[in-house]
Amino acid sequence: MRSHILGRIELDQERLGRDLEYLATVPTVEEEYDEFSNGFWKNIPLYNASGGSEDRLYRDLEGSPAQPTKHAEQVPYLNEIITTVYNGERLQMARTRNLKNAVVIPHRDFVELDRELDQYFRTHLMLEDSPLAFHSDDDTVIHMRAGEIWFLDAAAVHSAVNFAEFSRQSLCVDLAFDGAFDEKEAFADATVYAPNLSPDVRERKPFTKEREAGILALSGVIGRENFRDILFLLSKVHYTYDVHPGETFEWLVSVSKGAGDDKMVEKAERIRDFAIGARALGERFSLTTW
C-alpha cells in the first residue's frame, strides 16, 4: 500500500461544526463520474480551476492558481486550513466529500490527465469519524480517523465505502508537482508533516474457493435490470475478504458470461476498462442504458 498518513492536526470542533452545518445545506447534485457511486455521495468544490461553485471536474491547471468558489467563503475554518496548512502554489483543487450508506466502485484517478501519475498528490483530511467507513488501496483496507491527513494513491485501484448512515466528511486537497518532489512539500506548515503515525488497518477474512463459487453463482440472479446493483454489491466484497478490489470487475465479467447475455458481458468489460483502464477527460458511462 502506497497510501499512508502524512500527519495529524487537532480540529477545532466548534469552528468545524459551523462549517459542517453550512455544507449540509448545499443541495446534492449529480457528480462528475456519478456512475462510480450509489447511495449518498456529495462533493462540494471549495477551490477549482474556474472558481465556479458547480464545477466539480478535476483538471490540470495551466499556469494559473486554483480559484476559491463561493462555498469557500462560507466555510472560513476549512478555508483557513487549506490556505495555511497546504502549499498553495501546488494546489489544484480542494473539495469536501461525504459518503453515507454508499460505496464508490474500485477505480483509478488521473488516467485522463496529462502529467505523469507520480506528479499528482491527493490528500484527505478526515473531518468526521464514521466507524464503518473505509478506504481501500490495492491490497489494503484502512479506516481514516478524524484529524488524520492521508496521502491517497489515487492512481492505484482504490475504493471507498460507508456501511452506515453516520456522516463521514473529509477535506480532499489535490496538489500537483512538475517533477520529482519530497512529499513534505505538500505543506506550507512543515510541523504538520509527521508520517510515522500508525494506521488503522482493517483485518479481513481469507477469500476462499467456496466464497468465489458463491459469487459466481450470481450468474443465476444477474440481469440487465439489476446489473448496476450487482456491480455495487461486488464492489463491497473486498472490504470483508482479503482480495484485490480489481477482482470486482473480473467477477462481473464472469457472472455476465454465466448468464449468457452478450450485452451484459460487453458492458462489464467496458466499465472495467473505464474505471481502472483509460478514459477521456469528462467522459461518462451509463450502467443502465442498453
UniProtKB/Swiss-Prot annotation:
Its cofactor is Fe(2+). Pfam families: Asp_Arg_Hydrox, Pro_3_hydrox_C. Keywords: Dioxygenase, Iron, Metal-binding, Oxidoreductase. Fe cation binds at residues 107, 109, 158. Inhibited by metal ions such as Co(2+), Zn(2+), Ni(2+) or Cu(2+). Is also inhibited by EDTA in vitro. Unlike the procollagen-proline cis-3- and trans-4-hydroxylases from mammals, does not necessarily require L-ascorbate for activity although it does increase the activity of the enzyme. Optimum pH is 6.0. Is stable from pH 5.5 to 8.5. Coiled coil: none annotated. Binds 1 Fe(2+) ion. GO terms for molecular function: metal ion binding; proline 3-hydroxylase activity. SUPFAM superfamilies: Clavaminate synthase-like. The keyword Metal-binding applies. Optimum temperature is 35 degrees Celsius. Is stable below 30 degrees Celsius. It catalyses: L-proline + 2-oxoglutarate + O2 = cis-3-hydroxy-L-proline + succinate + CO2. 2-oxoglutarate binds at residue 168. Its EC number is 1.14.11.28. Belongs to the L-proline cis-4-/cis-3-hydroxylase family. Dioxygenase that catalyzes the 2-oxoglutarate-dependent selective hydroxylation of free L-proline to cis-3-hydroxy-L-proline (cis-3-Hyp). D-proline, trans-4-hydroxy-L-proline, cis-4-hydroxy-L-proline, cis-4-hydroxy-D-proline, and 3,4-dehydro-DL-proline are not substrates. Homodimer. This is L-proline cis-3-hydroxylase 1. It comes from Streptomyces sp.
